[in-house]
Amino acid sequence: MAKTNISPGMQQYLDIKKNYPDAFLLFRMGDFYELFYEDAVKAAQLLEIGLTSRNKNAENPIPMAGVPHHSAQQYIDVLIELGYKVAVAEQMEDPKQAVGVVKREVVQVITPGTVVDSAKPDSANNFLVAVDFDGCRYGLAYMDVSTGEFCVTDLADFTSVRSEIQNLKAKEVLLGFDLSEEEQTILVKQMNLLLSYEETVYEDKSLIDGQLTTVELTAAGKLLQYVHKTQMRELSHLQALVHYEIKDYLQMSYATKSSLDLVENARTNKKHGSLYWLLDETKTAMGMRLLRSWIDRPLVSKEAILERQEIIQVFLNAFIERTDLSNSLKGVYDIERLSSRVSFGKANPKDLLQLGHTLAQVPYIKAILESFDSPCVDKLVNDIDSLPELEYLIRTAIDPDAPATISEGSIIRNGFDERLDHYRKVMREGTGWIADIEAKERQESGINNLKIDYNKKDGYYFHVTNSNLSLVPEHFFRKATLKNSERYGTAELAKIEGQMLEAREESSSLEYDIFMCIRAQVETYINRLQKLAKTLATVDVLQSLAVVAETNHYIRPQFNDNHVITIQEGRHAVVEKVMGVQEYIPNSISFDQQTSIQLITGPNMSGKSTYMRQLALTVIMAQMGSFVAADHVDLPLFDAIFTRIGAADDLISGQSTFMVEMMEANQAIKRASDNSLILFDELGRGTATYDGMALAQAIIEYIHDRVGAKTIFATHYHELTDLSTKLTSLVNVHVATLEKDGDVTFLHKIAEGPADKSYGIHVAKIAGLPKSLLKRADEVLTRLETQSRSTEIMSVPPQVESSSAVRQGQLSLFGDDEKAHEIRQALEAIDVMNMTPFQAMTTLYELKKLL
């Protein structure tokens, strides 16, 4: 960056820029925001705007690019979406009155995690996450600056931190400690996050809570410090810090949520085809956000679940009232976002009108809720604050046709302020007064073509042609002489003109001041508005779930304390919605008190994965308080769901399908309890047949003997069905098929017992493979099955506790010699779960050299 012969204005730019080296600096110059030097070059490319230069004839011209101030937000949005920060430097004084260089200051730093304004607003949350580490546990705080939501928790390990960040769909993570290189790679390269750093803790006594740990306080404090530092103002809309525990909700990793298509379809990354899409009959942006939160965090408290169920049942029983409620909610705007705009000093007249319109709807919503005449609904009614005084203020103060910008005028209603009304009367009637003066002077002077004109230089004046100069009255005074005419004024005309100019200037200034005063008054109601927003959002989600339940004929699930799963004629709610009720084939699912594992076999495409997902979605819907897709459901309360459904290599981190499978299996068996649900689909596919089968059997046995979680394990290893003879809590089920005249029909119904065939060649036939290829595959299969029966090479008997090896004690794999001890130490030092395939190969090579 060349800095020779820098002008005072450019020196000001450089002085400001050095404080924001990691951000694009938008430097306000008149009607444009300008960028210079490297910022200009990079922005021109990213924003597809013209790149020019300042002082083009200089030896080192300065690269320059700019965007109009009135459309700057759309360009800021692009930079933020690409993961950059933007610092906005405004002119702090009127350039016309400035002495020397116009004073400029950065008024806001916009980052991916602190977006409030956007040219394309999104109803979804935008969370900024802060993480701190005390050497033992992690503190994680998050905030949506646009709504004021502010929460904190503590977590045991980095895996939990990563999962929570993914669940929050954060775009920016604020760190108060140094990450390891591997952790940084995960966050930046795999999760595509912007990492920011903050060392200072915001000093705020209101943050101190005896229930918070030190690491939670520092995470929350650094988050607050960063937000105040970037937003550069007091944020009155920030809500009280809420402490939460992961264990208070049904725990699911991001991978689990993704495989179950909870908030978006994993194949399309769109909302359509997800559980969120199915359940969303909300009418407000606040309700949409809350519904997503409920899906993300189902409850584990039976009391809280039943409370939601009860309200949904009340709504279901009153169609007319519920319809009125839904229609009334359509008139509710995003109170949370409107409150934040007020807090940021960015709320315009349209924003206040939306807020006023919302408040006008609240009494109707409250009356409808009261009409349900239900104690559980009355709790919601009692939480609704109508704020009639604020609604009255907005209704009487803001003109219903007010523009979106403050500078255009016509904001304040007539009758709200006497002075403003007077000025408007002067402006409105002034033209009539001038017309009266013109008519009077024309008649008295005898100048038939006498008229009053106006221009910026001379103001209002009488236009008199040269032929009529002899008729000019004595009280006229000359203002200007032209070639064929002269311009005159009078004391009376000057007085009227002065009144009109004063009225125009004072009206504009007064109207602005009145609006600022009203906005300041609205800000004092923010806490009450946020409480109202939460209640209306809850009402919206509950009516949405009632509408979905009625439309799709869902039933109210029951809960038990004896670890029994009973689902009669259950359906995969999303698949049913996509396919249609007539096409979908329901399935019952049953786990008695004794059964902990269902081993499911059957061909591909027969419905095994759908059966597993059906159970998971039923549990999630039930524990979020929703009704479910079945004829009858009775469930235990689960504390976590672990899944491995579907295969996809993690190419970015260099992890294969098999490695990802093993990592997810490890997380499940380490974290699951006997109150958890485990769903494993075809575990062990990514390695050799015997290796995969051995691992699958060992995992099943481990879950059976040590974990005790309710588990569905889908497999193509038919040999594993023999485990039912040894494992007392395992039962076999299979997907039924119908064979007739060489054709196979998949019935998509689950039946007891193991499958007798896998029908893989039939699936290949459906896929359209050549007949000659299928014939050859059938020949090979026949030969392999014959060999298997004769040599029993495929037989992998389950572990038998009474075997001689167990009775005699397991022999040591390593022995007692020094070389074996060295190999053992090397193996124990390996962090298998965090190795890439390349690292694993390298380590194996090094171990081989020790032999």
From Swiss-Prot:
**Binding residues for ATP, per the UniProt record?**
G602, P603, N604, M605, S606, G607, K608, S609
SMART domains, alphabetized: MUTSac, MUTSd
Q: List the disulfide bonds.
A: none
Which species is this record about?
Answer: Streptococcus pyogenes serotype M2 (strain MGAS10270)
Query: What's its job?
Result: This protein is involved in the repair of mismatches in DNA. It is possible that it carries out the mismatch recognition step. This protein has a weak ATPase activity.
Q: What SUPFAM superfamilies does the record tag this protein with?
A: DNA repair protein MutS, domain I, DNA repair protein MutS, domain II, DNA repair protein MutS, domain III, P-loop containing nucleoside triphosphate hydrolases
Descriptive protein name = DNA mismatch repair protein MutS
One annotated GO molecular function is: damaged DNA binding
NCBIfam families tied to this protein: mutS1, PRK05399.1
| Designated gene of the protein | mutS
For this entry, list what GO says about its biological process: mismatch repair
Nucleotide-binding keyword on record: yes
Keywords linked to the UniProt accession? ATP-binding, DNA damage, DNA repair, DNA-binding, Nucleotide-binding
Protein family (similarity comment): Belongs to the DNA mismatch repair MutS family.
Q: Per the record, GO CC terms?
A: cytosol
